[in-house]
Amino acid sequence: MTLPQAIRDKIFLMEEVINFPTSLLFHKNYHWENLAMVHYSNLSGAVESLMERGRKVAIATGFYVPAGNPPATETDGPPGALILTEGLKYLGMEVSLLSDEYTLSTLKAGLKILNLSERDVPLIIFPLEHSDVDHSSRTVNEEVESPLSIRFVQEFMNGPLGRDLSHLIFIERVGPNHTLESFLAQEVPGNSSLKDFEIILPPLLRNRCFSSRLEDITRFTAKTHFLLEFGKKWNPSFESIGMGDRGNEIGSGKIPWRVFKDHGTSNREPVFCCRLKTDYFISCGISNWGGYALMAGVALAKGRLDVLEKITPEQEGMVLNHLIHHGPSIDGITLKQDYSVDGIEFNDYMRVIERLKEIAFE
């Protein structure tokens, strides 16, 4: 099914808003890090996919910051996952939330403030792989070294929550950076950037999960990317959507490594950029905005704008505040329990969300 042009135009405008939001904001000195990714963003494709095939959806999120005060998951990711969870469920889809133990309390707090039980929305906890304590475990055959993760993927895909899964959505979920194999799979034959890759990413830095500060958080990160790499062995029909704002999130593998090397805003992007690609990728200045845009697009396409009526500054502020204090969650930039997301104070953060809603209702 192809969306009517009028709806496609609105979705294009939403995508523009979440990638180039500066004109909407009171403070103009924010620094956006997603510009290299915008060309690869496909919000309309993600909307069409959910519109046509959305039945049973699993949403993965959680970006843990061990250097935070306190150490906690970011405020970017869970709010976007929760708005999608609530909205898609309202539209009649089965929805589950998936993360690891470091984000569990935040997601539980989110469901509680939304008056949703774990019977309404199952919480799936992907186990941490003990081998990741050994730094060298990622430089050998990772599948062999990760029996716990492989078994979990198999059991999930064959179980009641994964069987007949139509969509797997990743929102601000950190994923591993490149390996030599993933780099070569992206490269055009004869390209001379192999030497650059080997200099920038020596073997012991490959297949690791990094924050944008180049903090190695591999041992704090369950291998949720295995759902993409190996999940189709047991469920070949699901489609995947990824959302990110820096390039170290699952889904960003849609963007070639050399793009991050040549057009990144710092020399850190080619180190931390994730190799995992999804069927559809949504670039955004803040990943939560991608979740709101996807929800607004699906509501618009289905003619169900009533789904968006609950989205107000008061409601979203209440949810964010609850996550901060009861998750807990922290701002990934300030590293504190601030009433902000990625360094963007709440009023400015909310202006983008309100604009998405305005576009849908225009």
Describe the residue ranges of each PLM region:
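Structural motif
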Residues: 56-58, 166-167, 239
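Short glycine-rich anion-binding loops that position phosphate/pyrophosphate groups of nucleotides
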Residues: 62-65, 173-176, 246
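C-terminal functional extensions of proteins
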Residues: 242-362
